[in-house]
């Protein structure tokens, strides 16, 4: 096998495809959130629902990135080792990134969806800013925190990508 073998190359193609499909699909979630807020109402809720569905599928590709990465190390015939600093750092950052996704972003997204659904159910025009439902303020705070979470997720991904491409110290 080794890094020049067909099995390694096939796994590498799958690994890269999963990176593109998984992380690429989630890279613009902050933008979708902003767009849904601007659309508002049922249209915004529909946009968020579709984005949520796509993101849940993308997460499986994000998980596959890890599995395929482990297989790449195993089939590299010692070209890559878990003791190499860049690889250990990339793995640690991957798990931190998953922690941001599940412990921060998904938790906030669930709350955001609940509040947005409550707000969508409200009917009748608002006559002044004093009539603004409290849910609007809550949504704005949640949106800011979600934007921060997605930003952190994306920055961590870019650092991991840098480590994978340039392999500092290898």
PLM region descriptions:
Residues 1-170:
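Polytopic transmembrane helical bundles with strong interfacial aromatic enrichment
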